[in-house]
């Protein structure tokens, strides 16, 4: 009976210890599961941030490409304006030379007029006025061309500055994407390790649960044997009293 009682107590102690181990493993497993859920949420948020950063990077790249195209177009327009300005400048010089020539001829004509060539002089004066008007018109057009050229130069400077800013933003966004991707990889690795640890603890939990079931079964058997022995002992005591 004492041996059976000790077995029962040992079984009960083993049952208590096993229950405590089960509770500890259950707490650890719950903590790991919560940690994995948090890491999954962080990973999802990081993936969203990466997608937004990549989209922003693409938008900045498109904007930079457009700015470069606009700058190229403005440079082409500036070149055309410069060519036009150079052409007008050449025309201006030619007109000035023509006026000088005509003025010289006019001076000569005045001499002729003094000798009776008044009609020829009037024609030359009319021609001089006509050329002066043309020169004035050309000068106005030249001034407009210079104004347009300066405006184009300012626009090119603005586009160049904007292109440089877009390029810097593009580099910054690319660096951000690289850092976020590294962070995502680290979270994925931690999540995989946590899941592996959770699976290991689950296996341990199942093993301990099996041991607990066996310990409970042994405890029940021991308790049943103790009860039988007690009943048998009472029967033996009763029979002894009756025989006396």
From Swiss-Prot:
Q: Which residues form a coiled coil?
A: 1-244
Keywords, comma-separated and alphabetical: Actin-binding, ATP-binding, Coiled coil, Cytoplasm, Motor protein, Muscle protein, Myosin, Nucleotide-binding, Thick filament
UniProt note: domains:
Limited proteolysis of myosin heavy chain produces 1 light meromyosin (LMM) and 1 heavy meromyosin (HMM). HMM can be further cleaved into 2 globular subfragments (S1) and 1 rod-shaped subfragment (S2). The rodlike tail sequence is highly repetitive, showing cycles of a 28-residue repeat pattern composed of 4 heptapeptides, characteristic for alpha-helical coiled coils. Four skip residues (Skip1-4) introduce discontinuities in the coiled-coil heptad repeats. The first three skip residues are structurally comparable and induce a unique local relaxation of the coiled-coil superhelical pitch and the fourth skip residue lies within a highly flexible molecular hinge that is necessary for myosin incorporation in the bare zone of sarcomeres.
Per the record, its GO cellular-component terms are:
myofibril; myosin complex; myosin filament; sarcomere
- This protein is called Myosin-7
Reported function: Myosins are actin-based motor molecules with ATPase activity essential for muscle contraction. Forms regular bipolar thick filaments that, together with actin thin filaments, constitute the fundamental contractile unit of skeletal and cardiac muscle.
Q: Where is this region: Disordered?
A: 216-244
Q: Where is the composition biased (Basic and acidic residues)?
A: 232-244
The source organism is Papio hamadryas (Hamadryas baboon)
Q: Where does it reside? A: Cytoplasm, Myofibril; Cytoplasm, Myofibril, Sarcomere
Reproduce the miscellaneous comment text.
The cardiac alpha isoform is a 'fast' ATPase myosin, while the beta isoform is a 'slow' ATPase.
Q: Which GO terms describe its molecular function?
A: actin binding; ATP binding
InterPro entries linked: Myosin_tail, XRCC4-like_C
Region entry Rodlike tail (S2 and LMM domains): which residue ranges? 1-244
Q: How does it assemble?
A: Muscle myosin is a hexameric protein that consists of 2 heavy chain subunits (MHC), 2 alkali light chain subunits (MLC) and 2 regulatory light chain subunits (MLC-2). Interacts with ECPAS. Interacts (via C-terminus) with LRRC39.
Q: What is its main location?
A: cytoplasm
């Amino acid at each position: 009976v004492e041996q059976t009682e000790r077995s029962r107590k040992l079984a009960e102690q083993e049952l208590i210890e096993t229950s405590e181990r089960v509770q500890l493993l259950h707490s650890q497993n719950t903590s790991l599961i919560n940690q994995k859920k948090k890491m999954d949420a962080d990973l999802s948020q990081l993936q969203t941030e990466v997608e937004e950063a990549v989209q922003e990077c693409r938008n900045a790249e498109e904007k930079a490409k457009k700015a470069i195209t606009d700058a190229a177009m403005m440079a082409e327009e500036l070149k055309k304006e410069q060519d036009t300005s150079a052409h007008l400048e050449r025309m201006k010089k030619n007109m000035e030379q023509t006026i000088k020539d005509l003025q010289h001829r006019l001076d000569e004509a005045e001499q002729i007029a003094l000798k009776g060539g008044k009609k020829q002089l009037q024609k030359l004066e009319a021609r001089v006025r006509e050329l002066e008007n043309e020169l004035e018109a050309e000068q106005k057009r030249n001034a407009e061309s210079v104004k347009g050229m300066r405006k184009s130069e300012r626009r090119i400077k603005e586009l160049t500055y904007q292109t440089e800013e877009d390029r810097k933003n593009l580099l910054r966004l690319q660096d951000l994407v690289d850092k976020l991707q590294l962070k995502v990889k680290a979270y994925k690795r931690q999540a995989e390790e946590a899941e592996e640890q959770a699976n290991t603890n689950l296996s341990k939990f199942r093993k301990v649960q099996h041991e607990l079931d066996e310990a409970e079964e042994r405890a029940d058997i021991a308790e049943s044997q103790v009860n039988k022995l007690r009943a048998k002992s009472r029967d033996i005591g009763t029979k002894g009293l009756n025989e006396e």
